[in-house]
Amino acid sequence: MDIGPYVLQLFSGLSRAMVLFLLSAGLSLIFGVMNILNFAHATLWLLSGYITFSIFQFLGEQFGASPWLLLPAILSATSLMALIGFALERFLIRRTYDRELPEQLLLTFALVLIVGDLIKLIWGVENRRINLGVEPVEMLDTLINPYHFVIVGSGVAVAAGLWFFLHRTRFGKIVRAAVYNRNMVSALGIRIPIIYALVFAAGVALAGFAGGVFLPLLPMALGVDHDVIVQCFAVVVIGGFGSMLGTFVASIIVGVVYSFSILFWPDGALAMIFLIVIVVLIWRPWGLFGTELRY
């Protein structure tokens, strides 16, 4: 029995899972703390991919082509996306806190259209991808792109960093408290608007990091963010809103199931994800690791 294709799909699924985690972690954090469903989250991820591409190209022209230039390109794009996220919260999102959910969704959907047209204006409609020129390695009867290990390692490192931040730092504990009772946090004299701005910036920064990490694996293209945001919402629903552990576990489930579904049933890959969502909602409507009630 040739296990090569299964090994390849496993690594592909784990890589997809880590990208989904990086994206969904920011989405879950924003919703858990701010109660905002950011429909433009994946579009900001797409924007970060294009920004990373441009920075990588610029650095290559200045210092010569090298795969190591990807790191400063990703970090620069992530920092820029954090600033963009801070500005979006300050001037747009903040005005929707007392509005109904449909109005919030309309605003973030408008951002999808605006950012999409901005990408088309600056970068055109061509696909963008970074070719690192790294040779594949042979493993278990198949050739594996070693960049899969980079993506998986990055995802695990960010997950560990988020856990440490949320459980071992004062600001992280404030963020966790705001998930369950933001009124009590405000009563303690903590300025909630600043918490919101920093959380939104951090969530967009995670999406930005995911966009840069994803770029050497598959090309960025206009419209791909629409499929990705659906998978992100599925991850957050399965794992439970506001739960980082749930987001991590659900990302692995969705990524691996989607990858193997492409191998066995390509047309039904997305349907398999929705089937998992339906089963989880019937069994645990608040998600695998979510809380049943919010006070």
Regions found by a protein language model. Give the residues of each.
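Membrane-embedded helix boundary and interhelical linker motif in transport proteins
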Residues: 11, 34, 39-87
